Amino acid sequence: MNGSWITILSLLVISQLASSKVTLIGKNTFLSFDDVEANFTPVVRRSGEYGLLYAAEPLDACSYLTNMAEKGSKFRPSYVLIVRGGCSFEEKIRNAQEAGYKAAIVYNDRYEELLVRMAGNSSGVYIHGVLVTRTSGEVLKEYTSRAEMELLLIPGFGISSWSIMAITFVSLLVISAVLASYFSVRRHRIRQHVRDLHHGGQGHSRMPKDLLQSMPTEVYTGVLEEGSTSVTCAICIDDYRVGEILRILPCKHKYHAVCIDSWLGRCRSFCPVCKQNPRTGNDVPPASETTPLISPGPNSITSLQSFYDLPIVVRVYL
């Protein structure tokens, strides 16, 4: 639901950015109207174009205009208001240009007509041309030939319907990806929580550092104790070297201190070999997807490891 509202809001913002504006500015007056630029006239500058507005004579500008543009300062160019119909858009624009106007604002002659991009031959056309609705044109006509009123042409960003569709499609993809990631992470956390509950909160709880450091250690001398055949760390699968520090768990299994510290401090609090909890001395936890069904015996040469935690290793002495 939230994604739908985001998409709708994006479309509204894009539609506002894509439309250009015709704006009347005067003392205590500020009126703005949507317009569409012609496709054969120069594009309105980003900074906008402004000037004084006059009504064409004749109003349809299908013949040479009898009211020529006033020769004022170059900073106050003259714009002309023209009604649609009677001849082509191109003919209206060219007649306005011949009369010395710098821009032509054409308005629809019917209320129900939509704004379209006026078409024509761009050769020799150097003035701006825009189309507004009939309602906008009638309001603009009331403010023609008034020196205190200034007309400002504000360009749009020229976003086409295809661009809007592309942006909408990309937005939907991004929203879908975010939602998919959210539900994927949520599902993973739920599964992890269920797995922790299944193990009674012990098999995957992190061991406190102070308890870990309290377990005894010894320096490996290369001399095996009576009855001991372990010369390899079951975690990193490397042989012990003389001088290395080994940590001894309550179950009497030994490992590299670095390896077992990382193992027990990383959300695992059981012996990698016998699966006993070093804190409580509990027996092997119930079989699950993270613990094997059969624990290795003391005389076994095969060390079965957890499916997620350690690989299966077979060590053969020749």
Swiss-Prot record:
Lumenal topological domain: 22-162
Gene3D superfamilies xrefs: 3.50.30.30, Zinc/RING finger domain, C3HC4 (zinc finger) (3.30.40.10)
Q: Could you tell me which cysteines form disulfide bridges?
A: 62-87
Can you list the GO cellular component terms from the UniProt entry?
endomembrane system; protein storage vacuole membrane
- According to its record, how does it sit in the membrane? Single-pass type I membrane protein
Query: Has the keyword Flavoprotein been applied to this entry?
Result: no
What name does the UniProt record give this protein?
A: Receptor homology region, transmembrane domain- and RING domain-containing protein 6
Task: State the organism of origin.
Answer: Arabidopsis thaliana (Mouse-ear cress)
